[in-house]
Amino acid sequence: MNNVIKISEHFWIFEEDGVRSFLFEGDERAMLIDTGFGTLQIREMVAGLTDLPVFLVNTHTDKDHTGCNKDFKPVYMHPAEMEHYQNSLPEGCCMEDVCPLWEGDVIDLGHWKFEVILTPGHTPGSIMLLEREKRMLISGDTIQNGDIFMFGAGRNMQAFQNSLKKMIAMADAFDSIWPSHGSYPLTADIIPGILKGAQDMEAGKLLGQEPPWPMPCKKYVCDVVAFLY
């Protein structure tokens, strides 16, 4: 399976056209984080890696993270994300399958324990998942070195900057960052650069370029990341 990368025992990544999903196998159940665009047969790929029951957590619900949501139940997300999800509900999905995850909740898989951290801005209910013992952070789209989409419904640049400040304050809790886009793993050193880029963009210090595809935005490039805004 060329799209599957085994990172360590009980931890795999699925790569799909610039976006990735994560699978963590626990003692009695497994957790899938996001489901990509839907071009991969993620359900079959997961079944080939674990015999355990699988539940799904969405870091957020942009369409490149929910393409195979219909194949998994239940689907967990922060309640602040549910309206965003409902407004573009993927085919075959229904809100009855959605369960809430709140900030501070701990997803206990046995040898994996992930704490939910609310980091709005990219979307209203974007979350990260922190494994404190293994010192790793699943960051969704908020911390990455690719293109961060900050135009359109649900985006909030001030909330985004506040979320970055929150993660800077928590940086002593993790060593590796596993984003949905760009390269991996990253370290916490990148977060101040993302924040500075966002601040410089708002201050008019970055030159807006034409986006890579026809979109109602400009592309702003800083040292560590680019914003589509």
What is each PLM-predicted segment?
Residues 32-35, 53-64, 76-79, 118-121, ...:
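Active-site neighborhood of phospho(di)ester-bond hydrolases with catalytic His/Asp-centered motifs
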Residues 37-110, 195-204:
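Active-site HxH/HxHxD metal-binding segment of metal-dependent hydrolases
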Residues 5-8, 74-125, 131-134, 146, ...:
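Metallo-beta-lactamase
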Residues 2-48, 129-140, 144:
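Conserved beta-strand hairpin/beta-sheet module of binuclear metal-dependent hydrolase folds
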Residues 165-229:
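Accessory terminal helices/loops
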Residues 143-154, 196, 201:
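Active-site-proximal segments of metal-dependent phosphoesterases and phosphodiesterases across multiple
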Residues 38-41, 61-67, 83-84, 124-126, ...:
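Active-site environment of divalent metal-dependent phosphoester hydrolases
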Residues 37, 89, 149-154, 189-190:
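Short, solvent-exposed loop/turn segments at secondary-structure boundaries
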